[in-house]
Amino acid sequence: MNFYKIAYKPNLQGKFKYGQHFYDFDEGGLVFVSPNQVSAGQLTNGDHSGYTLLIHPDFFLTYPLAKHITQYGFFSYAANEALHLSDTEKTTIMAIFNFIGGELNSRIDDFSQDVLISQIELLLNYSNRFYKRQFITRKALSGDLLQRLEEVLTTYLNSETLLHHGIPTVQYLASCVHFSPSYLSDMLRSLIGQNAQQYIHQKLIEKAKEKLATTSLTVSEVAYELGFEHPQSFSKLFKLKTNLSPLEFRRSFN
């Protein structure tokens, strides 16, 4: 379906079947789906009433939103990564939905589209704020996540997997902790100020420093052991992250 979809079920007291899995939505959930994204699923029970907003990309094609809507990462989140709202947040979100509904049912004039798009942007910006709160308030989950990511990358970087499959990808890392890549990156950004790709690079550089400092491997050999196809790519990343070339780092360490 070639629409952006924003759906909120404030009174949902059931479970959502997505693929082969069931997810608990007892708190209600605000869900975002990008155009042509597969979102097939079914509610097994509970109150299904709520709000659904479908927005065709052409509706805001001539507005700044067309360029920066991709910056709202939650349009790429999975069904089990919905935004769960507090009572105050529910009031805010429902007020915006109701305002949009009222505007759509009013007489169209020269300002209708401007007003609707401003409200859509308001909805998206509030959702950004509330997702940030969700990341922060679920600290126990966040701590476990960071520990698990550390374990996954340490195991990967110390195994032959690195030689055979190359540098770990964000997709691989996300699959190991059962998150979508976008949700993982946004959560990491809120916790440590880095997205998932930057986090992987940080761990690669730490491993590279270890090899440069404790072995006699050449820079090319270090690069290949870390999964780089081309030593130049490794040297470029190392210089970007440390302001030193691999050889300069080795000399300074010695």
Regions found by a protein language model. Give the residues of each.
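A short, Lys/Arg-enriched amphipathic alpha-helix from helix-turn-helix/homeodomain DNA-binding modules
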Residues: I117, K139-V177, Q198-L217
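N-terminal regulatory/effector-sensing and dimerization cores
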Residues: M1-A78, D109
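Amphipathic alpha-helical segments enriched in hydrophobic/aromatic residues interleaved with Lys/Arg
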Residues: F74-L122, Y126-S127
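Terminal helix-turn-helix DNA-binding modules in bacterial transcription factors
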Residues: S190-E229, R251-N254
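C-terminal regulatory or interaction extensions
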Residues: R129-A140
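Append "Primarily bacterial transcriptional regulators
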Residues: G28, Y172-F179, L184, L188, ...
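…primarily DNA-binding HTH/wHTH and HhH modules…
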Residues: S235-N254
